[in-house]
Each structure stands twice: as C-alpha cells, then as structure tokens.
Amino acid sequence: MGYLIFGAFFLFLLIGVPIGLSIGLAALVVFLQAGIPLQMVPQTLFEGNNSFSLVAVPFFILAGDVLARGGISERIVAFAESCLGRIRGGLSIVSVLASMFIAAISGSGAATTAAVGASLLPELEERKYDVDFSAALIASAGTIGVVIPPSVPMVLYAVIAGESVAKLFLGGFIPGTLMGLGLILWAIYIAKKRNYPAGKKYSAKEVWHKFVTALWGLMCPGIILGGIFSGIFTPSEAAAVAVLYTLLVAIFVYKALDFKHFYKLVVGSGVTSALVMFIIATSKVFGWGLAFYQIPQAIAGAMLSVTGNDAFLVYLMIDVIILIAGMFMETASALIILTPIFLPAIIGVGGNLVHFGVVLTVGLAIGMATPPVAINIYVASAITGLPMGKITKPIIPMVLILCAVFFLITYVPGLVLLLPGY
C-alpha cells in the first residue's frame, strides 16, 4: 500500500498537479482502494487545521510581508551598512547579518530573501560586487529565515509531533547563527580574493542617526521573542503581536504603507496563507492514510533493520532523504509529509524530538537554495533579472557550507538542545 500512496503522489506531481492537490488526491486513492467511508475526508481535512498553534502561520506570513514592504527591512539594512560597510567586502557581510536579523521577525525564507535582496542587491551591483555572487549569497542567507525563530516550519512540526513551539524556537538559535557565521566567512574569503571595494565610511553621528531611524524595527525581535520566552504570550499570540507592531511602525512611524498598498499586501498574504493551510489540511488526510496502513512503522522497522539500530546510520539515511526532498518539494509540504514517516525511527533510536525538529527544518531550509525548486534563487533571480543558472554556480559552495552545519547539528545534538535546557 505504501507503493500505491507514494506512487500516486509522485505521479500527480509529475503531471503538474499542484502540491496540495497531489497530496490530497494520493490520499483519496488510498481511501477508495481500502473502502474507507469518504465522509472521513472532510472530517480529517477539518482536523488538519483545527489547532490553535496554526493561527501563527498566517500571522507570521503577513508580518514577513509587512517587514519587506513597510520600510522596516530597508532601515535595518541601512543601519547595518553604516556599521560594517566601511570594511572590504563589508556589504556582503551586511547581507548575511541583515538576513539573520530579519529572520528573527519574518519566519520565512522567501520573505527574508526578498526583504534583503530588494534593499541590498542594487547597491551591491553599484559597488562593483559580482551580481551572481551577491544574489547567491542573499539566497543562501535567506534559508536562515526559517531556522532563527520565529519559524513557520517549526510551528508546523510542533503541531504534528506534539512538541513545544518555544523549545523548538530556542533550539534554532545556535544552528541559525552557525549558518550565518559560515556564510560570513565565505563572503570575507571571496571579498579578499576578488578585491571587492570598501564602502563609505560613516561618521559616528551618521551611524547614530541610522540607529535611531532603525530602532523601531530593531525592537521587533526583542518584543516577539522576549514575549514568548518570558511567558507573556504564546507563539500564536506573538505572531499576532508581530503583525500589529510591524503594521503600526510601517503605517504611522515610517509612513511607508497607505491603504491601497496595505490592501494588496493583505490579499497577497491571504493567498499565500490559504495555500499553506490547504497543504496542511490535505497532508493530514495523507498522514491518516499512512497511519491506517502503518506505513511509518514499516519504514522505521526497515531502517532499523538495515542499520542494525545504529543511530548514526539511521540519522545519516534520514539526513540524505531530507536534503533530496528539500530539493524537489516546498519546505512546509515536505515537513508535513516527512515528520510522521520519520518520527517512529527517531523514537526507535532514542532520539530527541526537539533536536530532530530543528534538524529537519535546517535540512529542508537548505532546499530553498538548491535547484530545481530553490524558491530563494527564484526570488533573487526576479530581483536581479539574472537567469537561475547564473546564480546556481556560485551558490554551490554556500550550500556545502550549510550542509556542513546540517550534519554538525545532527551529530552534535547539544548545539540544538543547549538553549532549550535538555
């Protein structure tokens, strides 16, 4: 039966059926073949979205869009540039640091790439940085958007695995920081090798002015994450606070949004949220079909049998599958499908589910910068006008750096579990 459900899923994908429909139709095939009453389908679809934690998903998506289009990201980037732009290759370092900071607000890789790319790519080109390298760096740094909290994929994983969203968020800090540091070191190496120029030297007064201008945006991560970890509000409530705060700043402080642009922004975010929530709902039906035939348990049994219950080999097999899945599937849909499949194997080798949730998120995030799907490369390509192939070559070493961090946190779980307190 596993061959039927996965075969149907990949067949629908190959003929161009959207991912959400492919998941739902594959599950429907199993329902029909097994003679399960079809009344179960709408009930299971409803259950898929019937979780308070999922309220965070559309709110974080909207907050990311407001951040990118409300003038907040531009001012954060300008402040970072005033601090570091004076050193050789400083603007490329700013690209990564800005991505890390904006990741702490948006919760989305594509939103992070769009926000930083729109602000910095034109200036990088003007300063004689190679456009393909700059686009690749920002696209790869955008993957940090779903690792440093808040993170939409981590919210989805928490709902499926029954884990704490706050602990997953804490677990993402160190891996996200390591990803950023790796990319910064690569950017410094390339800047010296290609003799990229130093930027403008700002006076202390100018730096202070940039800081004051960006302060409202700089306060946002502290309000969101501080509120979550201090227990003032839940992650779902934090998402609503993020939207309210970014809207107030964008409309009344920076005056970068009017009603017309706000309407378009809300509609666009609503469409994106609807697609994500539809994928979540159909994945619940898909997961029900898998559980009905005990396919996750069968896969776990096969993995444990092949590896002799060796945790190192089990994690290695899972890591490779995660990286491949991330190359061909959107992050949220891949996470929703893979989580129930791999959890029995992780439990079987005594793995920590918070650790695995962060590992899964990082692995799938790398797929955002790995063709053929590579949504972050698409975003960078749209901003620069470069074809994807031009960005793919310089992004390869950056993806390898991210993969090194991925395997490091897999086999050194303390890097993930230190802050959650395990």
Label the predicted regions:
Residues M1-Y422:
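Alpha-helical transmembrane segments of multi-pass membrane transport proteins
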